[in-house]
Each structure stands twice: as structure tokens, then as C-alpha cells.
Amino acid sequence: MRVDTSSAGPGGHGPRWPGRVAGWIRGHSLRLVALVVVATIAGSAAVVTDTLGAGYAFSRVVAHVQLWLDPPPDRPTVATVDVTPEPTDAPTQVPATVPGSPGATPVGSLATPARLPVDVNLVTDPDAVFISEIKDVWCAPAGTTIVLSILGHGTNTTAFETHLAGQIGQWDSWSDSHDGGWGPGAIALALGAYGVPGYQVRAYTTLASEMRDATLALTTTHEPVVLMAWYGAHTWVMTGYRASADPTIFHNATISGAYILDPWYPRVSSIWGRSAAPGVFHTMADLAVNVLPWRRPEGYYPARDLKFIAVVPTVVAAPAGAGQ
């Protein structure tokens, strides 16, 4: 074997760092150029003032550069399930009577419940379960911490949120979040890992369809729903709702809004304004300007783009500590 000592230290020993540095620069030249270009563009007035949408376009460039420099793992995650809206004008199902017994009491049921307004909320003391996101990009681990706290599988402490955020390496996936980190699939996987299995990522064509499905899931499982707000960039934890009637019985019940725990609180967003206090009721009009169809700057998500996304419970979780 021929040993090249041309750039070694005296006697052919010692570090060959000049050559190594040159090699590193050659191998990373494109990355260095990309970083310089991004930094230069970032300082332009058009980007700072978002002239003609330059700010949004630049955010896409930054996202793609970040993805290129440090791509997330390409591995399976929780699939996104497309939900077909149910007809809202379907008649309420009335149990049949025993054949040959006109006017008899319905079999296996009492009389049809009265159509009355409902006000449902899983949380009576929002402050007992709420925690703000420690970092302004930690809405997903904060929202997950809130859900686990509500269900008794976690605590609303900075220590727990920080620990949970540090576990993302177990659940991140390119298909779930192109720019790495937390996506709705990671939220579902994290909940399952901490004793709350069965959460499903669902996609809807309308906000009304999303809210109807969310109310059904929350009512039947007694577990919160995670709504992907702000075009999929943020998480809201839905703990209850108001409706003109019980949506599990009356298909055409009108949903008037939802109770929300927003991890962004007490911050103020330059785009979305001041976050509401934990547990505040949000009308459908308020939801309509915050819970918006998925549109992410880092790339395309065929199963999610332009759809309303939620992480929805499908089974009743075992009580914390069960089986121990």
C-alpha cells in the first residue's frame, strides 16, 4: 500500500487537516452555497414585508433547504384516513316495536330521547390539565401532553413536555412531516406509546364534516380530539362542544362550536392574533378562521393537501395504571 505523505506532518505522521478541510468544503460546497443564498434572500425587503407573497415563497425555499440538509427518516407512520361526509338529513333511527303488538314499547330501548341542546365538555378545570408549549415550535408535544394529562397518562409539567418532545426520534417520518419532527401521525404514535392507543389521523373535505366526526368520536370515547389548525402548522385540543341536539342520535344536529385548549396561549401571533385562554368556547365562525385546510410550505402531502385534518380517538383507553 502506498502512503501519501505529501500533506502529513513531519516524518509522514500527524494530522492531514488541510486536506481534510478542503475535502469537506468540496463535499459540502452546494450546502454552503445554499445557506449563503438563503441568508441573502432573507434580508431582502420583499421577504420582510411579504410583498406579493414573497415571504410565503421564501418560507418554502427555507423548508426545502432544511429538508435537503437534514431529511427525516423515510419509514411508515399512521395512515391518513379519508372520511366521507355522512348525510345530515338522514332521519333519526327509531327502534322497531315487537311484530303484532301495535303501540308496544320499543324492544331493547326506552322512548326516543327528546331533541334538546347539549353542552359537552370533558374538562371541568382547564388549568389542571393545560400546559403552554415551552418552545414556539412545540405545539404538538404540548398538545399531546395535554391529552395525556386529561386522560391520566401524563402530567402537565414542563419536565413531562420536554421529555416527550425529546422522544420524537421514535416517531418522526418523512411521510408524516417532510421537514422532520412532529406531524399528526407522530402525535397518534406518541399517544399510543403512553397508554392511549387507537388515535387515527383523518382527513375531511369540509370543516362541518370534521366537527361532526369529532363530536361523535369525543362523545363515544370520552377522549379529546386534536385539531390541526393554521393550515396544519398548529394543534388545538378539543375537549367538548355545543350542539342543537345529541349528534350521536340526531344526524342533523347543528354543531355551534367547540371548547379548545390552545398550547400557543398566552402568546400573541402576528398572523393569528392573541390566543384564547384555556377552555374557552370557540364558535364555528372562530373555528373557520383558525382550523383551515392542510397546506404546508415544505412540500406536498397527497392524502392531506387542502383537507381538514384531525387526530381522532377510536377506542376507549384503559385507565392509567390498569394492569400494573
Residue ranges of each PLM-predicted region?
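Compositionally biased regions
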Residues: 7-8, 45, 102
